[in-house]
Swiss-Prot record:
Keywords: Aminotransferase, Transferase. It is an enzyme of class 2 (transferase). It catalyses: N(6)-[(R)-S(8)-aminomethyldihydrolipoyl]-L-lysyl-[protein] + (6S)-5,6,7,8-tetrahydrofolate = N(6)-[(R)-dihydrolipoyl]-L-lysyl-[protein] + (6R)-5,10-methylene-5,6,7,8-tetrahydrofolate + NH4(+). HAMAP family: GcvT. GO terms for cellular component: cytosol; glycine cleavage complex. Disulfide bonds: none annotated. It comes from Xylella fastidiosa (strain Temecula1 / ATCC 700964). The keyword Transferase applies. Belongs to the GcvT family. The glycine cleavage system catalyzes the degradation of glycine. SUPFAM superfamilies: Aminomethyltransferase beta-barrel domain (SSF101790), Folate-binding domain (SSF103025). This is Aminomethyltransferase.
Length: 368
């Protein structure tokens, strides 16, 4: 049976086109995906991301568990509220999931994991936690909203009780704090997102969600569907689990080597494989592509390089660049002339560094 968020009726009343996304009925757009994309880049949009899974970890051994569980190092997390992006790996070095972990107290950390991997993640985390003094708690009582765009932070802050505004305005990137709404209900606000824009992601009680959603709409924040969320994240150079990486792909093969910390004395799951890959290199890599000719890059299209064949992972039309962009996994080595097979035509594409767009600005290498 398909799942629905607390905002399902609200989305339908706003005219949203609803689709099945990882077993959840979610809005893909509210009329024009391209207009929604531009509104986030230029102003502020609100996303219902309540399909995401929130997992709280309690106990005296949470940090030792996470030092084992995650490829990035939670030893970086020393200030309450600070967050870290990491991959969770299997023993073969493949990515079980990518996630954000928050340090709240020494005996209390929080995960935000993907909707599509919920059952797998919970099973894996519980299995690993069984050797530690840790209690794993899924927070199905919480909903999640993302407010993103250059005006997003101001719009959210204006809705908070005055006693909390200053602290939220000063909140640094990849940091969170809990404040009270006007109705005195707890809001967990983090300065994170999946769009390449500034903004907040907000966890709140299910019963408070419609009230906050409507209050933000009244300020001029527009509802944004998952279609624009995908084009925004791709422009921002952000991976999508299940499309850009999975359990057969290591972080080094998914342009996520920057999330791996091979710090001394920490034997995280998959480390042996990653150490070998770092020493010897990997046989394949993820690159960014931009197509100057008309057309769209699509998942699965064949990519031809001097080193051999690869394929498009994520591809889309970029509303900001007015060109097709994509990620591709291709053989290792410096790709020179690269072509994509589109309807039996080999179309030349350029290899460019990503992100393609960051905070509304086209990156300098795009139009070289």
């Amino acid at each position: 049976m398909i799942k629905k968020t607390i905002l399902n009726d609200t989305h339908q009343a706003l005219g949203a086109k609803m689709v099945d996304f990882s077993g959840w009925e979610m809005p893909i757009h509210y009329g024009s995906q391209i207009d929604e994309h531009h509104h986030v880049r230029r102003n502020a949009g609100i996303f219902d991301v309540s399909h995401m899974t929130v997992i709280d970890l309690h106990g005296t051994q949470v940090r030792p568990l996470l030092r084992r569980l995650l490829a990035n190092s939670v030893d970086k997390l020393k200030v309450p509220g600070k967050a870290l992006y990491s991959c969770m790996l299997n023993p073969q070095g493949g990515v079980i999931d990518d996630l954000i972990v928050y340090y709240l107290r020494e005996d209390y950390f929080r995960f935000i994991v993907n909707a599509a991997t919920r059952e797998k993640d919970l099973a894996w985390i519980n299995t690993q936690a069984s050797a530690f003094n840790v209690r794993v708690e899924e927070r199905a009582d919480l909903a999640m909203l993302a407010v993103q765009g250059p005006a997003a932070r101001a719009q959210v802050t204006n809705l908070l009780a005055e006693t909390h505004r200053d602290a939220v305005e000063k909140l640094g990137r990849f940091a969170a704090l809990e404040v009270a709404s006007h109705s005195k209900k707890p809001l967990f606000i983090s300065r994170t997102g999946y769009t390449g824009e500034d903004g907040f992601e907000i966890l709140l009680p299910q019963e408070e969600t419609i009230t906050l959603w409507n209050a933000l709409l009244k300020t001029g924040v527009k509802p944004i569907g998952l279609g624009a969320r995908d084009t925004l994240r791709l422009e921002a150079g952000m991976n999508l689990y299940g499309q850009d990486m999975d359990e057969q792909v290591s972080p080094y093969e998914a342009a996520l080597g920057w999330t791996v910390m091979l710090d001394e004395g920490r034997n995280f799951i998959g480390r042996n494989v990653l150490e070998q890959q770092k020493t010897n290199g990997v046989s394949r890599q993820m690159i960014g592509l931009l197509m100057d000719e008309k057309g769209v890059l699509r998942h699965g299209q064949k990519v031809l390089t001097a080193q051999g064949e690869g394929h498009i992972l994520s591809g889309t039309f970029s509303p900001t660049l007015n060109k097709a962009i994509g990620f591709a996994r291709v053989p290792a080595g410096k790709p020179s002339e690269v072509r994509v097979n589109i309807r039996d035509r080999e179309i030349p594409v350029r290899v460019v560094k990503f992100p393609f767009v960051r905070e509304g600005q086209t990156q300098p290498n795009i139009f070289d």
